[in-house]
């Protein structure tokens, strides 16, 4: 009687590899799998009756690729996603960037919402090439099978900086976040606003952060050691701005009298800190992302990008004339 040892010997592979192929697992190359199946047939081996999970129209699981568990910023997005998904009887599977690729397949899920800036475009495109619906919330990808639901960072940031200029601020410093599309758009708006009003921005006044409060603290420390103290520090997100504000106050500086600070995102704690910021409608962003994905899954949606507006929240960390 022919056994898997015989097949493994003929194919020149391990017994475990043969067992995986015969039981429908796909953790090997197509060439190896086809070779093993051909040898099994040639030797007269009776293949086990297995049930391989195939794509099903009944698959109602959505993958949410989310890795930034250290911040509350994304919680409202997740609430929006879950509220819409559950209203349509879809389940949610939260993945990290390490295992998302495995579950971004119609064997496991019906589609994916990506909120992880560390997830490579190439991985998303690879999944989309297999007619797998994908929504991205942090970037625009030039692919017909990927839809973007993004925030209009530029207009609100530019308006905020221009209002600061009109209120008398002339010396600016900027604290950037990670190298993402959102960060680039916010910085571009900042520079364009200064240029439009004839204000020169010096490289010495540019500080690099990583979205975290600690990087705001570090930037504030460096800024206070500088010989060129700005009138206002514009931060690419709220957590860095909050870190800077706390460090300034710890050092005895008054905010906004000695230095003004503003952020972006309107994090939960920002209103308690009196931080001027740009409010991003994250709940609505998540809700619309889930709605868009379900429509794509069910064949009624469009892959056209969706851009959401944002608005300024003026608070006590800046002295401005808004009328």
Regions of interest found by a model, annotated:
Residues 31, 66-76, 96-100, 149-159, ...:
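Hinge/beta->alpha junction and helix N-cap segments in small-molecule ligand-binding domains
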Residues 221-323:
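Flexible loop/turn connectors
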Residues 1-57, 182, 322:
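N-terminal helix-turn-helix DNA-binding module of bacterial transcription factors
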Residues 57-162, 225, 323:
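Alpha-helical recognition/docking segments in bacterial nutrient-uptake
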């Amino acid at each position: 009687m022919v056994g898997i040892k015989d097949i493994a010997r003929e194919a020149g592979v391990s017994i475990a590899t043969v067992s995986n192929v015969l039981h429908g697992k796909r953790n090997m190359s197509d060439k190896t799998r086809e070779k093993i199946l051909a040898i099994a047939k040639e030797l007269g081996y009776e293949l086990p009756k297995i049930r391989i999970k195939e794509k099903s129209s009944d698959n109602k699981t959505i993958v949410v690729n989310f890795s930034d568990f250290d911040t509350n910023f994304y919680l409202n997005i997740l609430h929006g996603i879950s509220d819409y998904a559950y209203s349509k009887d879809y389940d949610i599977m939260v993945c990290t960037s390490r295992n998302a690729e495995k579950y971004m397949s119609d064997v496991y899920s019906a589609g994916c919402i990506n909120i992880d800036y560390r997830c490579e475009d190439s991985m998303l495109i690879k999944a989309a090439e297999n007619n797998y619906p994908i929504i991205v919330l942090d970037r625009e990808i030039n692919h017909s099978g990927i839809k973007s639901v993004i925030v209009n960072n530029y207009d609100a940031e530019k308006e905020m900086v221009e209002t600061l200029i009109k209120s008398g601020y002339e010396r600016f410093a900027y604290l950037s976040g990670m190298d993402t599309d959102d960060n680039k758009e916010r910085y571009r708006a900042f520079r364009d606003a200064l240029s439009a009003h004839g204000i020169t921005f010096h490289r010495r006044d540019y500080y690099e952060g990583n979205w975290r409060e600690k990087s705001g603290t570090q930037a504030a420390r460096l800024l206070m050691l500088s010989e060129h103290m700005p009138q206002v520090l514009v931060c690419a997100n709220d957590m860095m701005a909050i870190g800077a504000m706390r460090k300034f106050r710890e050092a005895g500086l008054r905010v906004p009298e000695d230095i003004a600070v503003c952020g972006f995102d309107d994090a939960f704690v920002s209103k308690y800190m009196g931080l001027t910021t740009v409010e991003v409608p994250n709940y609505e962003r998540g809700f619309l992302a889930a709605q868009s994905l379900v429509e794509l899954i069910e064949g009624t949606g469009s892959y056209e990008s969706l851009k959401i507006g944002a608005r300024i929240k003026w608070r006590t960390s800046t002295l401005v004339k808004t009328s």
